[in-house]
């Protein structure tokens, strides 16, 4: 995902410095070229050899180190950087950067990078230090200059206090870096609505009717759209996975709740991808108390739910692109093509429950992308890769429509 990308990690003097070893390892596993820059104080918390072993690159500390092939090192490395993350960012280094002080390898490199690539800072310090008006003023100044400040978590701190100032987890920092550099931002400025997961229709306070959807495919589409620069709203039912970061999440338990949420979200959407498995039927009446077991059969009277995709197709706005999904057990292409026409879709993603590697629950999928004029069957791919191919197709359709 990060092959060919150069990530600079700036580590300052904080007990949270040890966490960056895990982050460096995560980035290397995604094939990023990682270089760590440390302040002298940071070396009191973690040894440079740790980072050199994990990244395969020399850890840079001294601006005047003579043991390298000659170049103006802080400028040379800044030219290669795709993103810089200063984490943990101490109050001292935050103050230096905010006020133009560049007196060591880390701060001079950040100064050289700030005008040419994203620079992120993750403050980590005692609560009283973080809330000090001077620190807050420096952070606000950095935001005005275009730096991104990753807000600290609240929790138990190394000093024994409880409050704000805890550096976010390695996964959170990793997600921030991915957001900046993992993909080309071809969806920047676009609003994308994605539905995911399964709805649940109550029978009584204990039981409900649902399906096998886990939300993995819809979440993959939402995640990839976010990484490609879109503002994403994810309307989700029950899911076996967590929603991706940096998306607006709207929870919807029933088909009726999802319909209302989708109607509201789709009003100003450029792209709508309806990947949720929504119940076609619901109990006509919901029992107020738990239904007791009894001899003999139980009959439930069901009624149709609103067809959300058909409503979206009937109310599609000019310039809006609508993508649906079709899970079938027979006559895949015929049934999917019929759904495409009936519901006024621009694209439908068809997959068969009978195909190995496709369907619910897994991390892979095998789909066919159908439009009015063509059908393209994709090979077995991860759901992230499938999501990218779906978004690629949507972008192609939008470009063709604008000609």
Q: Model segments located where?
A:
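A cross-family phosphate/adenosyl-ligand binding-site feature
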Residues: 1-121, 126-403
């Amino acid at each position: 995902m990060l092959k060919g990308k150069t990530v600079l990690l700036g580590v300052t003097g904080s007990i949270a410095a040890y966490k960056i070893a895990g982050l460096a390892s995560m980035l290397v596993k995604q094939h990023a070229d990682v270089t760590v820059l440390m302040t002298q104080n940071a070396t009191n918390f973690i040894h440079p050899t740790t980072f050199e072993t994990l990244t395969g690159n020399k850890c840079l500390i001294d601006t005047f180190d003579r043991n390298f092939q000659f170049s103006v090192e802080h400028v040379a490395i800044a030219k290669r950087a795709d993103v810089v993350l200063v984490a943990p960012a101490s109050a001292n280094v935050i103050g230096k950067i905010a006020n133009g002080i560049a007196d060591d390898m880390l701060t001079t490199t950040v100064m050289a990078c700030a005008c040419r690539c994203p620079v992120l800072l993750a403050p980590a310090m005692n609560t009283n230090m973080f809330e000090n008006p001077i620190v807050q003023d420096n952070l606000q100044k950095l935001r005005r200059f275009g730096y991104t400040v990753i807000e600290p978590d609240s929790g138990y701190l190394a000093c024994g206090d409880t409050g704000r100032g805890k550096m976010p987890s390695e996964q959170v920092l990793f997600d921030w870096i991915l957001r900046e550099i993992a993909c080309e931002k071809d969806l920047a400025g676009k609003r994308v609505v994605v539905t995911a997961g399964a709805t649940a229709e109550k029978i009584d306070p204990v039981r409900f009717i649902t399906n096998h959807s886990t939300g993995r495919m819809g979440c993959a589409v939402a995640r990839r759209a976010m990484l490609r620069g879109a503002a994403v709203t994810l309307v989700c039912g029950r899911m076996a996975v967590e929603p991706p970061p940096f998306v607006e999440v709207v929870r919807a338990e029933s088909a009726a709740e999802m319909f209302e949420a989708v109607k509201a979200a789709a009003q100003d959407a450029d792209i709508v991808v309806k990947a949720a498995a929504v119940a076609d039927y619901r109990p006509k009446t919901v029992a107020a108390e738990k239904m007791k077991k009894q001899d003999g059969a139980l009959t439930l009277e069901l009624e149709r739910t609103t067809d959300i995709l058909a409503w979206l197709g009937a109310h599609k706005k000019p310039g809006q692109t609508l993508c649906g999904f079709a899970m079938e057990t027979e006559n895949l292409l015929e049934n999917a093509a019929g759904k495409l026409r009936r519901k006024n879709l621009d694209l439908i993603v068809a997959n068969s429950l009978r195909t190995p590697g496709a369907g619910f629950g897994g991390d892979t999928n095998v789909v066919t992308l159908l439009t009015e004029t063509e059908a393209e069957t994709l090979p077995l791919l991860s759901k992230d890769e499938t999501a990218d191919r779906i978004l690629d197709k949507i972008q192609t359709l939008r470009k063709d429509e604008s000609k």
